[in-house]
Design a protein with these regions (language model features):
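A structural boundary signal for the start of the first folded domain, especially the loop/turn
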Residues: 1-77, 85-165
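Short basic (Lys/Arg) and small-residue
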Residues: 81
């Protein structure tokens, strides 16, 4: 899996899982995931943990990457966006299928854009733009043929937990 990690600045208000997005914002984000997944065989999953379970945020991200079944997609082209809200930690993990198609800096760019949005308190805009960007690269490398079925291999609803795992 490919990954990028960053800790977004702690200068803002500490937030819990339910406080990161309100229900309407969450619905917009889930619809954005579905919209982009309709264009590709790739899968985009977002997991929001209230806090990390240890000091190693990547360990938590990898735990959810496996637990949510992202490594079990047909084309190994799933992507996890992992957020630990109270610890201000963000990671993106791409499975081997998509990792082999993009430059490692791609993930770092997405993390940077998301962190800038979080710093500006534009969480929904940042998350939607990140999903759109990931969706676009998935559609570029894993496009659907006109007659190809596209089962939703992984749930589009946001995954949430109290701790990283």
């Amino acid at each position: 899996a490919s990954w990028a990690e960053a800790v977004f600045p702690a200068g803002g208000v500490q937030v819990g899982v339910g406080e990161l997005l309100n229900p309407k914002e969450e619905a917009v984000l889930v619809a954005t995931i579905a919209e982009w997944e309709a264009k590709t065989s790739g899968e985009i999953v977002i997991h929001i943990a209230k806090k990390l379970s240890s000091k190693d945020g990547m360990k938590d991200a990898y735990f959810w990457f496996e637990k949510l079944g992202i490594t079990k997609t047909k084309n190994r082209n799933g992507v996890l966006l992992f957020i630990a809200a109270r610890d201000h930690f963000v990671a993106i993990l791409g499975d081997v299928g998509i990792h082999s198609k993009v430059e490692p800096d791609f993930w770092n760019q997405k993390i940077h854009l998301l962190i800038e949005a979080f710093k500006s308190n534009d969480k929904l805009i940042g998350l939607c733009r990140t999903v759109e960007s990931i969706g676009a690269v998935l559609a570029q490398h894993f496009p659907l043929e006109s007659n190809e079925s596209n089962p939703n291999e992984l749930d589009n609803a946001l995954s949430k937990s109290h701790e990283g795992h």
